[in-house]
């Protein structure tokens, strides 16, 4: 996240029809908010197709489900439909706490036809090749957007959906501002009973990958860590990572001022997260809980939070009920109230979002592809 990922909340303001070509500030609930999901190059800055909004990992029907959402239309009428035909969309899987991924599922798309449909291909890369860009990998299946494709215990669907994410963005403003400034969080004027879902009626492009429990590496009981990335072909013939994300809400909370989308976290491998950002993030969390009086050991709490969130890889035990909640962070379902959990974590106290999973019940399904196509 983000990627927003990724990241929703980064896209704060945007009921006013912003163009994704502009990274200027907008005002929500009386304060300025940056539109801060990563824009890493001039080309990326013009293309929401590369912006990761969310990633989900959960148990399906005797399977593991991986979902990556990109290209939210909350950025306005200039959003380009579909997936970028010169990009790669990758799910990265680590096993048993390993530093590097040894399984990558890579999804690519061709240019859209007259009906807006795109040919899609899924490749799998294993071992050391899973973290490299040059290997082609094994072609698993080929299909078209808007239609399910399957082969060898793997199913893939990609297309436009109703966005299942939910948050009242005015609450975000009350938390990420203090995190940035190291001041106390003041929720005295926050009224959870009046919360509204800022993402109601919005749409995203979604990639849904379902892998059978018969997969030799993804059998029940296997401990995995998952993150996703978008990559864009370069003029030199290589690939540049544009966005990536594991845990939800990372950019909206910790890097809300990344208005030019040049934060090095965009292109960094998760294995470098703690070294690059651990001290900085721990200090900010410590300052917030110290000012808010929610911890007797602010420095220790800040370090504890960072140790939980870095590397930015979402943990999951294959075959178990997924939940991104207060009891555990084990994968993430479409219903989970991830913003409430993440905001509470950095605040050091419970933050009531005022929203329940039922607010977006109509934006998710019980069967493959588990999302609601539009």
Residue map of PLM features:
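Surface-exposed extracytoplasmic segments
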Residues: 34-374
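Short, Lys/Arg-enriched N-terminal segments with co-localized hydrophobic residues
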Residues: 16-34
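Extreme N-terminal basic, low-complexity initiation segments
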Residues: 2-6
């Amino acid at each position: 996240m983000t990627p927003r990922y990724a990241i929703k909340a980064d896209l704060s303001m945007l009921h006013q029809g912003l163009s994704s070509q502009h990274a200027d500030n907008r005002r929500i609930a009386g304060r300025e908010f940056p539109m801060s999901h990563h824009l890493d190059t001039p080309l990326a800055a013009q293309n929401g197709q590369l912006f990761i909004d969310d990633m989900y990992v959960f148990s399906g029907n005797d399977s593991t489900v991986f979902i990556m959402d990109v290209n939210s239309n909350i950025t306005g009428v200039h959003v380009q439909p579909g997936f970028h035909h010169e990009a790669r969309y990758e799910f990265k899987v680590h096993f048993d706490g390993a530093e590097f991924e040894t399984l990558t599922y890579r999804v690519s798309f061709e240019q859209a036809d007259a009906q807006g449909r795109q040919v899609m291909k899924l490749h799998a890369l294993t071992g050391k090749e899973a973290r490299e860009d040059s290997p082609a990998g094994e072609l698993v299946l080929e299909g078209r957007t808007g239609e399910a494709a399957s082969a060898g215990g793997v199913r893939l669907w990609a297309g436009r959906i109703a966005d299942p994410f939910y948050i009242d963005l005015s609450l975000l403003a009350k938390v990420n501002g203090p995190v940035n400034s190291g001041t106390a969080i003041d929720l005295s004027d926050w009224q959870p009973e009046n919360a509204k879902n800022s993402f109601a009626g919005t749409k995203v492009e979604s990639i849904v990958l379902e892998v059978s429990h018969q997969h030799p590496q993804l059998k029940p009981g296997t401990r995995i860590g998952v993150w996703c990335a978008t990559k864009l072909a370069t003029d030199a013939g290589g690939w540049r990572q544009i966005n990536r994300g594991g845990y939800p809400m990372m950019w909206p909370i910790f890097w809300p001022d990344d208005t030019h989308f040049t934060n090095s976290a965009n292109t960094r491998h998760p294995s470098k997260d703690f070294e690059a950002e651990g001290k900085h993030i721990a200090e900010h969390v410590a300052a917030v809980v110290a000012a808010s009086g929610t911890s007797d050991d602010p420095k220790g709490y800040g370090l504890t939070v960072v140790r939980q969130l870095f590397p930015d890889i979402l943990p999951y035990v294959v075959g178990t009920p997924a939940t991104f909640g207060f009891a555990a962070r084990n994968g993430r379902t479409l219903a989970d109230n991830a913003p409430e959990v993440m905001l509470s974590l950095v605040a050091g106290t419970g933050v009531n979002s005022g929203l329940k999973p039922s607010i977006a019940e109509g934006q998710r399904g019980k069967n493959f592809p588990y999302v609601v196509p539009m």
